[in-house]
Amino acid sequence: MISSSLDMLEESLVKKIEVMKKIEEENERQKEILKNYDEVDDKAFEETVDNKGELIDQLLLLDEGFQALFDKVKEELGDNKDSYRDQIKRMQDLIQEITGLSASIEANERRNKKLAEGYFSAARQKMNYSRQTSAAAFNYYKTMNNFKDIPPQFLDKQN
């Protein structure tokens, strides 16, 4: 019973690593999308956000299942840890790999957040510039329409 439970815990950790690697791939894809503010594909960006959301949901499910099973196995394992030393060592190695991936993902997320903030800031500036240009053109149009019936003010009168 304990051995099969430890196998399931190990399998859960392996799946978690696979999901985390997929998140890293999505982060790289997101970085490429956001790299050049003028050529951002909004649809592709949204797709990466959705994909990462699904992957994070998978991670949460794996974590919940792992924790529930771990709590049961922990009690049963008790003093028999030496009997399962190899399995425990493999799981510790997997947990170290997960910790490294987690740190890498966090760093990539911070980088992508800065890129996204830059993109949104540039987009806001473009919108403000367009709004200002449009307002200036409208004001010019209104002003010119108001002055169309006024005769010239400066006439050269020579006697």
Give the role of each language-model region.
Residues 54-69, 97-108:
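Amphipathic alpha-helical coiled-coil segments
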Residues 1-61:
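Long, hydrophobic N-terminal alpha-helical segment
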Residues 65-90:
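Carboxylate-rich helix-loop segments that flank metal/cofactor sites and access channels
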Residues 84, 88-159:
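Short terminal interaction segments
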